[in-house]
């Protein structure tokens, strides 16, 4: 048993990164949805460029806008359309354009110094290789994130960095579940900018309410909001 498990997202939580995620909306017969650009505009989502692939036209959103897109799409009635994604720009972390969110990094460093505690990074980025609509590419996120954190004084080993390779919040929740069951922490502190990820972690309260205290903490522009405990 440990006292605390600290879980941090990377993009837009520990650091501001420059990466775009492509989204294409496809009709049941396989054609592009001609209304998708208007849907983006109506929801105040602004793509910075577009690219045509064999599966459709991809509209590329900055990572923080993609998090907003996820929340809107999850609650919208999309009918029989299907959204597909291009995460190629998230295959690695560029240290030249990545800026630390110093306030959250400070929390991470303090967490590292806590006795009988564990710190892990869980990111939606891909791990070793990634399938994209434009071909397979190698991913270096685990190594890149470890090197970036080391450069700012945070010694998180690669074995404590988990690129789950999916924007599905349940994938992050599954990593946290494994650590709860393995280490039986008294408290879990989960930091993320994405409300869907925070909601998925909060759902673990029902499963582990007699085992651990779970706190979901939203990060916005490098600032943390008050922790949301289990009900």
Kindly give the residue locations of the regions a language model identified.
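Surface-exposed alpha-helical segments enriched in charged/polar residues
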Residues: 105-113, 177, 181, 199, ...
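Solvent-exposed loop/turn segments at secondary-structure junctions
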Residues: 13-14, 126-129, 194-197, 222-224
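A short alpha/beta connector and helix-capping loop motif
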Residues: 23-43, 201-223
